[in-house]
Amino acid sequence: MASPMQKLGGTVKTVSHGALVFIGFVATCAAGMLAHSFLRMQPLHGLEFVSVLGLAVVAARMKIKLPGLNGNMSVNLPFFLIAVAQLSLFEALLIALASTLTQCFPKDGGKPKLLQMLFNLSTAAVAVGLGSLIFHDSPLRGVWSSGLPLVMATATVFLAQTMPVATIISLTEGVKLLRIWSSIFQLSFPYYVLSVGITSIVTTASRQVGWQIPLSVLPVMYAIYRSYRVYFGRALPQANDLAMAKGAGAAH
């Protein structure tokens, strides 16, 4: 969902009862969203669906470690938003789940953690599902500028992804919720703004040219991935040094 669609994947150090309850709640919401998508199922969009699915899966492997947070971000968000805007709810959920599942596998070939995978998949399903419902069912569609439903859907995806991530980090690491969410907001908000801009251009061009337009987004996202990697690579040592200094100060 980035996120991820910004998408984060922290390590659950100590799974508290509260964290387990929250993960169960998010998973239940995701199951409900999937069931709802089955009830609203429409014919697949064929090549357009397959192309966005493939692009989202490839983009999911372009992961960046976030400085100061126990998590990472992939550059698959524009493809989530393209799915939200141009495909059905069921198709958007399939793309989000496949891309997020791909993101869950560590680059070093290690095994993913099942509880973490469940949480990440559930969060992505809820976020993208809500975004799709907001976009397609908004009463503002056709009344206001055509870009407003996309902005509303992106804001929904942003909140539905970042708030659960901040909550689970708060529950597992004992850090204040608003402090965690503020850090996530500062790191990921520009990426969401960029993603909604890219999606707006793609959806407009697709009406004139065709479904092939999303294919041009992957090189752009790779360039963004490289830029973020360089920027966060410089910021990460500083964040680690700050965390160590705080830990040393707390020990005295």
Task: Please name every model-derived segment.
Residues A2-N72, F80-R229:
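Short helix-perturbing small/polar motifs within transmembrane alpha-helices
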Residues V175-I180, Y231-H252:
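Membrane-proximal helical linkers
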